[in-house]
């Protein structure tokens, strides 16, 4: 169906992509890069990944096969220049960094701490949550894959349907993440598993880059006046998974059965699971899957929504494959369900 090139295939998300691609036969990975691992084979680096072709890692600057779809799993500053380069060369591109998600340049540069020299490409990117932007993704040549925390918040709120119009413009989010989603791609020892074992802490309070992402896309899809988002991420002593608790307020108490609304909104969504009670939401139920589990509870005007996903799958590589399937006309669930 499609030839795939993965730049940054030696990182956590890159490895997860290789695992997912190894489980299907319609897309073919033809090119992988990692400056640190150049010259080594997949089996040398990831012996647990059973891949049809034992590809050799190339350097980032090596020539990418002409007709391949390019997946960028590289640092933010690399994606700024790489995405336009490959688009201009005729490639379809999926960018897993955050530098093509936000449409306000000042806010983007503030939260990502860089100068964005290719901001004119922002409007070309489709935000890659398939459950919201499926029709646009089918015709996209450039997809900005969403953040893991952002997916866990934006999608549950979107599934409230028309009730979003009754929400007050203030959203409080408390998210817990394993180390692979909270900085595990960096060499910062503060995010290593040894530093969090028997430990627990908050980080990037009121400064996390997914906060403006949540604000922008909840606003654009809900009709809320520009919502205030108070987002606090925490670092769990586990490897993978995100659990988010989202507190919302309605102008007046909704009379509808909210679980039924979620169930109806997600009726044809293969990766959304609605559970009857928030207490049923657990990381172990979503780890190594592309599922997003959601539940909620209401008291008066207050609504508490709980969601969970695997940050490396639905929060990154799995959602990227879901988008690739849509972009190439493949079955959306290809490589993502048993």
Swiss-Prot record:
<dbReference type="GO" id="GO:0006526">
    <property type="term" value="P:L-arginine biosynthetic process"/>
</dbReference>
<dbReference type="Pfam" id="PF22698">
    <property type="entry name" value="Semialdhyde_dhC_1"/>
</dbReference>
<feature type="active site">
    <location>
        <position position="148"/>
    </location>
</feature>
<comment type="similarity">
    <text>Belongs to the NAGSA dehydrogenase family. Type 1 subfamily.</text>
</comment>
<dbReference type="GO" id="GO:0070401">
    <property type="term" value="F:NADP+ binding"/>
</dbReference>
<comment type="pathway">
    <text>Amino-acid biosynthesis; L-arginine biosynthesis; N(2)-acetyl-L-ornithine from L-glutamate: step 3/4.</text>
</comment>
<keyword id="KW-0963">Cytoplasm</keyword>
<dbReference type="InterPro" id="IPR036291">
    <property type="entry name" value="NAD(P)-bd_dom_sf"/>
</dbReference>
<protein>
    <recommendedName>
        <fullName>N-acetyl-gamma-glutamyl-phosphate reductase</fullName>
        <ecNumber>1.2.1.38</ecNumber>
    </recommendedName>
</protein>
<dbReference type="InterPro" id="IPR023013">
    <property type="entry name" value="AGPR_AS"/>
</dbReference>
<comment type="function">
    <text>Catalyzes the NADPH-dependent reduction of N-acetyl-5-glutamyl phosphate to yield N-acetyl-L-glutamate 5-semialdehyde.</text>
</comment>
<dbReference type="GO" id="GO:0005737">
    <property type="term" value="C:cytoplasm"/>
</dbReference>
<dbReference type="InterPro" id="IPR000706">
    <property type="entry name" value="AGPR_type-1"/>
</dbReference>
<keyword id="KW-0055">Arginine biosynthesis</keyword>
<dbReference type="InterPro" id="IPR050085">
    <property type="entry name" value="NAGSA_dehydrogenase"/>
</dbReference>
<dbReference type="GO" id="GO:0003942">
    <property type="term" value="F:N-acetyl-gamma-glutamyl-phosphate reductase activity"/>
</dbReference>
<dbReference type="InterPro" id="IPR000534">
    <property type="entry name" value="Semialdehyde_DH_NAD-bd"/>
</dbReference>
<keyword id="KW-0560">Oxidoreductase</keyword>
<dbReference type="Pfam" id="PF01118">
    <property type="entry name" value="Semialdhyde_dh"/>
</dbReference>
<dbReference type="GO" id="GO:0051287">
    <property type="term" value="F:NAD binding"/>
</dbReference>
<keyword id="KW-0521">NADP</keyword>
<keyword id="KW-0028">Amino-acid biosynthesis</keyword>
